[in-house]
Amino acid sequence: MLIPVVCFTCGFPIGTYAAIFDKARTEYIKTKMGGTLPQNIPLDASLQIELKDLITALGIPMRVCCRTHLITTLDYRKYY
């Protein structure tokens, strides 16, 4: 699924920050997985990776609705 260009609720331009967040998310997931890509290890249902603080750490000024769109959109081709 693609990240929307603007937030459906408030109209914030999410698309301008999508590439920055995607790169940071990939690196964050790789560090949480021990330096390997998720496609190279078996799926573990108990693994929890919190992404809510990643947007704050990047300094992206977003509301909760925008964070929901950005965090829940995942391009499965990169990980599976």
UniProtKB/Swiss-Prot annotation:
Alphabetized UniProt keyword annotations: DNA-directed RNA polymerase, Host cytoplasm, Metal-binding, Transcription, Viral transcription, Zinc
Pfam families per UniProt: RNA_pol_N (PF01194)
UniProt-listed PROSITE patterns: RNA_POL_N_8KD
Protein name: DNA-directed RNA polymerase RPB10 homolog
A cellular component annotation (GO) from this entry: DNA-directed RNA polymerase complex
One GO biological process term: DNA-templated transcription
Compartment annotation: Host cytoplasm
Family assignment from sequence similarity: Belongs to the archaeal RpoN/eukaryotic RPB10 RNA polymerase subunit family.
GO MF annotation terms: DNA binding; DNA-directed RNA polymerase activity; zinc ion binding
InterPro entries recorded: RNA_pol_su_RPB10, RNA_pol_suN_Zn-BS, RPABC5/Rpb10
Cystine pairs: none
Keyword Transcription recorded: yes
Signal peptide: none
Metal-binding recorded as keyword: yes
Role of this protein: Component of the DNA-directed RNA polymerase (RNAP) that catalyzes the transcription in the cytoplasm of viral DNA into RNA using the four ribonucleoside triphosphates as substrates.
Self-association state and partner proteins as the record states: Part of the viral DNA-directed RNA polymerase that consists of 8 polII-like subunits (RPB1, RPB2, RPB3, RPB5, RPB6, RPB7, RPB9, RPB10), a capping enzyme and a termination factor.
Residues reported in the UniProt entry to bind Zn(2+): 7, 10, 65-66
